[in-house]
Amino acid sequence: MKLFQLLLLVLTISSFIISNNGLVESHQGRMHRGSGERHHRAGGNQQQPQPPSEQQVESSYNSNDDGSSNSWWSATSWYGAGTTSWYSGGTTSNPVGTTTWYSGGTTSNPVGTTSWYSGGFGTYDSDSSSFSYENSSNETIVIYINPVTLVFTLVLLLTFIVLTITQSLRKY
Protein backbone atom coordinates (compact mmCIF):
# COMPACT_ATOMS: atom_id res chain seq x y z
CA MET A 1 0.00 0.00 0.00
CA LYS A 2 2.82 2.40 0.85
CA LEU A 3 4.48 1.82 -2.52
CA PHE A 4 1.19 2.48 -4.29
CA GLN A 5 0.72 5.69 -2.31
CA LEU A 6 4.24 6.82 -3.16
CA LEU A 7 3.69 6.18 -6.85
CA LEU A 8 0.37 8.01 -6.66
CA LEU A 9 2.04 11.01 -5.04
CA VAL A 10 4.77 11.11 -7.71
CA LEU A 11 2.13 10.87 -10.44
CA THR A 12 0.16 13.69 -8.81
CA ILE A 13 3.17 16.00 -8.69
CA SER A 14 4.11 15.14 -12.28
CA SER A 15 0.57 15.79 -13.45
CA PHE A 16 0.54 19.16 -11.71
CA ILE A 17 3.76 20.16 -13.46
CA ILE A 18 2.31 19.08 -16.81
CA SER A 19 -0.95 20.91 -16.14
CA ASN A 20 0.97 24.16 -15.79
CA ASN A 21 3.03 23.39 -18.89
CA GLY A 22 6.04 24.45 -16.87
CA LEU A 23 5.29 27.94 -18.12
CA VAL A 24 5.52 30.83 -15.71
CA GLU A 25 6.52 34.05 -17.42
CA SER A 26 7.74 37.23 -15.78
CA HIS A 27 7.55 40.50 -17.69
CA GLN A 28 9.50 43.35 -16.13
CA GLY A 29 8.99 46.99 -16.88
CA ARG A 30 6.17 49.07 -18.26
CA MET A 31 3.37 47.21 -19.98
CA HIS A 32 1.47 48.58 -22.96
CA ARG A 33 -1.96 49.28 -21.54
CA GLY A 34 -5.05 50.11 -23.56
CA SER A 35 -8.50 51.37 -22.75
CA GLY A 36 -9.73 47.88 -21.95
CA GLU A 37 -11.91 47.76 -25.04
CA ARG A 38 -12.19 44.46 -26.86
CA HIS A 39 -11.17 44.56 -30.50
CA HIS A 40 -11.60 41.79 -33.04
CA ARG A 41 -8.43 40.97 -34.91
CA ALA A 42 -8.84 40.70 -38.66
CA GLY A 43 -6.93 38.42 -40.96
CA GLY A 44 -6.08 34.75 -41.07
CA ASN A 45 -2.89 32.94 -40.28
CA GLN A 46 0.11 35.16 -39.69
CA GLN A 47 3.74 34.16 -39.59
CA GLN A 48 5.56 34.84 -36.37
CA PRO A 49 8.59 37.07 -36.94
CA GLN A 50 12.03 35.96 -35.88
CA PRO A 51 13.38 37.15 -32.53
CA PRO A 52 15.40 40.37 -32.75
CA SER A 53 19.16 40.52 -32.58
CA GLU A 54 20.96 41.49 -29.39
CA GLN A 55 21.43 45.02 -30.73
CA GLN A 56 17.72 45.33 -31.52
CA VAL A 57 16.84 43.93 -28.13
CA GLU A 58 19.02 46.43 -26.27
CA SER A 59 17.68 49.30 -28.38
CA SER A 60 14.10 48.19 -27.82
CA TYR A 61 14.57 47.92 -24.07
CA ASN A 62 16.18 51.33 -23.74
CA SER A 63 13.67 53.13 -25.96
CA ASN A 64 10.57 52.09 -24.03
CA ASP A 65 11.30 53.91 -20.77
CA ASP A 66 8.83 56.68 -21.57
CA GLY A 67 6.25 54.30 -23.04
CA SER A 68 6.39 55.96 -26.46
CA SER A 69 8.31 53.29 -28.33
CA ASN A 70 6.76 50.50 -30.39
CA SER A 71 9.36 48.08 -29.09
CA TRP A 72 9.84 46.55 -25.67
CA TRP A 73 12.01 43.78 -24.31
CA SER A 74 12.75 41.99 -21.04
CA ALA A 75 14.82 38.96 -20.10
CA THR A 76 12.14 36.57 -21.34
CA SER A 77 9.97 38.60 -23.70
CA TRP A 78 10.10 40.99 -26.60
CA TYR A 79 7.69 43.16 -28.49
CA GLY A 80 8.45 43.40 -32.20
CA ALA A 81 8.35 46.89 -33.66
CA GLY A 82 5.95 47.02 -36.59
CA THR A 83 4.64 43.49 -36.03
CA THR A 84 1.56 44.61 -34.03
CA SER A 85 2.10 41.64 -31.73
CA TRP A 86 3.73 40.95 -28.41
CA TYR A 87 5.54 37.62 -28.41
CA SER A 88 6.74 35.76 -25.35
CA GLY A 89 8.26 32.33 -25.78
CA GLY A 90 6.32 31.90 -29.01
CA THR A 91 3.12 31.11 -27.12
CA THR A 92 1.43 34.44 -26.47
CA SER A 93 0.70 37.61 -28.38
CA ASN A 94 -0.69 41.01 -27.56
CA PRO A 95 -2.07 43.43 -30.18
CA VAL A 96 -0.81 47.01 -30.14
CA GLY A 97 -2.94 49.39 -28.12
CA THR A 98 -4.68 46.78 -25.99
CA THR A 99 -3.91 44.72 -22.92
CA THR A 100 -5.59 41.63 -24.30
CA TRP A 101 -3.56 38.45 -24.49
CA TYR A 102 -4.08 35.09 -26.18
CA SER A 103 -3.01 31.59 -25.21
CA GLY A 104 -2.67 28.56 -27.44
CA GLY A 105 -0.49 30.13 -30.09
CA THR A 106 0.19 33.48 -31.72
CA THR A 107 -2.65 33.40 -34.25
CA SER A 108 -5.42 31.57 -32.38
CA ASN A 109 -8.10 32.60 -29.90
CA PRO A 110 -9.55 35.90 -31.20
CA VAL A 111 -9.96 38.90 -28.93
CA GLY A 112 -13.29 39.05 -27.16
CA THR A 113 -13.71 35.30 -26.82
CA THR A 114 -10.76 33.89 -24.92
CA SER A 115 -9.12 37.02 -23.60
CA TRP A 116 -7.89 38.30 -20.29
CA TYR A 117 -6.52 41.65 -19.22
CA SER A 118 -3.40 42.23 -17.16
CA GLY A 119 -3.78 44.75 -14.39
CA GLY A 120 -2.79 45.64 -10.89
CA PHE A 121 -4.52 42.58 -9.49
CA GLY A 122 -4.91 38.89 -10.24
CA THR A 123 -6.93 38.09 -13.35
CA TYR A 124 -8.06 34.66 -14.56
CA ASP A 125 -10.01 33.68 -17.64
CA SER A 126 -11.29 30.11 -17.85
CA ASP A 127 -11.59 30.16 -21.65
CA SER A 128 -7.94 30.91 -22.26
CA SER A 129 -6.80 29.05 -19.13
CA SER A 130 -4.61 32.01 -18.26
CA PHE A 131 -3.89 33.66 -14.96
CA SER A 132 -1.95 36.86 -14.38
CA TYR A 133 -1.10 39.18 -11.56
CA GLU A 134 1.19 42.16 -11.13
CA ASN A 135 3.44 42.28 -8.09
CA SER A 136 4.93 45.25 -6.25
CA SER A 137 8.03 45.21 -8.46
CA ASN A 138 5.93 46.03 -11.54
CA GLU A 139 6.36 42.49 -12.86
CA THR A 140 3.42 40.85 -14.56
CA ILE A 141 3.47 37.14 -13.78
CA VAL A 142 1.72 34.99 -16.39
CA ILE A 143 0.75 31.38 -15.74
CA TYR A 144 -0.90 29.09 -18.30
CA ILE A 145 -2.88 26.14 -16.96
CA ASN A 146 -4.18 23.10 -18.80
CA PRO A 147 -7.61 22.54 -17.20
CA VAL A 148 -7.87 18.87 -18.22
CA THR A 149 -4.63 17.78 -16.60
CA LEU A 150 -5.33 20.09 -13.67
CA VAL A 151 -8.60 18.24 -12.95
CA PHE A 152 -6.74 14.95 -13.32
CA THR A 153 -4.18 16.21 -10.80
CA LEU A 154 -6.90 17.12 -8.32
CA VAL A 155 -8.47 13.66 -8.67
CA LEU A 156 -5.10 12.01 -8.02
CA LEU A 157 -4.48 14.24 -5.02
CA LEU A 158 -7.91 13.49 -3.57
CA THR A 159 -7.33 9.75 -4.06
CA PHE A 160 -3.98 10.00 -2.29
CA ILE A 161 -5.55 11.84 0.67
CA VAL A 162 -8.40 9.32 0.98
CA LEU A 163 -6.00 6.36 0.88
CA THR A 164 -3.76 7.96 3.50
CA ILE A 165 -6.67 8.68 5.85
CA THR A 166 -8.10 5.18 5.34
CA GLN A 167 -4.76 3.58 6.13
CA SER A 168 -4.37 5.72 9.26
CA LEU A 169 -7.83 4.75 10.51
CA ARG A 170 -7.09 1.04 10.06
CA LYS A 171 -4.24 1.29 12.56
CA TYR A 172 -6.66 2.25 15.35
From Swiss-Prot:
Localization, UniProt: Membrane
Basic residues biased stretches: 29-42
Glycosylation site list: N135, N138
Recorded topology in the membrane: Single-pass type I membrane protein
Bias (Low complexity): 53-69
Extracellular topological domain: 23-140
This protein's record includes keyword Oxidoreductase: no
Chain intervals for the UniProt region annotation (Disordered): 27-69
GO cellular component, as recorded: membrane
Protein name in the entry: Uncharacterized transmembrane protein DDB_G0291364
Keywords of the record: Glycoprotein, Membrane, Signal, Transmembrane, Transmembrane helix
Residues passing through the membrane, by range: 141-161
Domain of life: Eukaryota
Residue intervals annotated with topology Cytoplasmic: 162-172
Leader peptide range in chain numbering: 1-22
